[in-house]
Amino acid sequence: GIYVAPAKGAGVMGHQKVSLRAGKGIEGDRYFSQTGKNRSNYQGQPDWEITLIESEVIESFNQQQGHSFHESDFRRNLVTQGIGLNDLVGKCFTINNVSFYGVQLCEPCASLQRRLGVRILPELVGKGGLRAQIRCNGVIAVGDKLTPV
């Protein structure tokens, strides 16, 4: 899935495809920066351009904790399948000819825990996903393949 929240605190909306801008983020997302400069605490920061999480992590969390959260509830932009995202820290990868760089792990935070209303720490530490930098402009769609470079 592909998810975007238009403003801080707003619910995320699912999309079939999104436009990405190098150094700026996902068009329409709360962290998108028109200028590429830091207009707030996060906009324009390479590790806030796009976030990813593994569907397998969400499924495992739901199963182990007895929950049925939807993948969008985790507030990551992309939900992937079949690839270990932790292995992409410090590495380049592509999705539909768009180049990305894995900046750091996207650890779960207290605000996500409050939003979900259940304990997610320490269960999701080291499993919360990946923060990545968008290296070139392009469009990605649901079902596009993530390929490590």
Q: How would you describe each model-predicted region?
A:
Residues 1-149:
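Metal-cofactor-dependent catalytic cores
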